[in-house]
């Protein structure tokens, strides 16, 4: 299987992570662990700092250093949380200040146990910026992920990866 470190090991691409989930200290710590595992740079800030600032610094670092892939991890958000959706909009806007073509991809991570609410999530996220793909997680649980087919068809979105656990090798290309 292709591991999460595929970008740096297999494809010989440079990767930088942006720890833009600044609300949970554990999120920053987890991303640091993953960055070390996959030999990626990481841009981070203090807890409760502005997530859009971290996203900006990450994209700026990637562009300046000719990094192939910048992955910006944001706080988990539901489409009915207005302040988090506004933050998502702000992140998109600050990325465009660096380069109008940014972000090149926006991949929404959906929990397979979410059910029909996933349709609403995709709809609301798509209003802010076009999504380019989905990652479906928790397919190792009892979830069947049936709504995913409806989402893919309605929004013409590919599934780029599926999560079958929490280990390094459990995120599989699809």
Across the structure, where does each feature detected by a protein language model lie?
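Single conserved hydrophobic/aromatic residue that forms the stacking wall/gate
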Residues: 1-7, 11
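Nucleotide-state-sensitive switch-loop elements of NTP-binding domains
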Residues: 9-105, 129, 146, 151-174
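Active-site/ligand-binding-proximal alpha/beta "capping" segment
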Residues: 91-93, 118-135
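Redox-cofactor binding/interface segments in oxidoreductases and associated redox assembly factors
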Residues: 72, 108, 136
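Residues immediately C-terminal
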Residues: 77, 115, 141
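P-loop NTPase motor core
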Residues: 82-86, 108-117, 123-124
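Glycine- and other small-residue-rich loops at beta-strand/loop junctions that grip anionic moieties
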Residues: 20, 47, 110-111, 140
């Amino acid at each position: 299987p292709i591991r999460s470190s595929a970008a740096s090991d297999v494809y010989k691409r440079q990767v930088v992570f942006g720890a833009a989930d600044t609300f949970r200290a554990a999120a920053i710590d987890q991303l640091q662990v993953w960055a070390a595992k996959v030999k990626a740079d990481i841009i981070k800030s203090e807890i409760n700092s502005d997530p859009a600032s971290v996203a900006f610094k990450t994209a700026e670092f990637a562009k300046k250093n000719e990094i192939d892939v910048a992955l910006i991890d944001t706080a988990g958000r539901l489409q009915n949380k207005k302040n988090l959706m506004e933050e998502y909009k702000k992140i998109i806007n600050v990325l465009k200040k660096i380069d109008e073509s940014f972000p090149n991809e926006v991949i929404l991570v959906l929990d397979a146990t979410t059910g029909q609410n996933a349709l609403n999530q995709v709809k609301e996220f798509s209003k802010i910026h076009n999504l380019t793909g989905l990652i479906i997680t928790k397919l190792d649980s009892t979830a069947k992920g049936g709504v995913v087919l409806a989402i893919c068809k309605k929004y013409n979105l590919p599934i780029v990866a599926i999560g079958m656990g929490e280990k390094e090798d459990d995120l599989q290309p699809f």
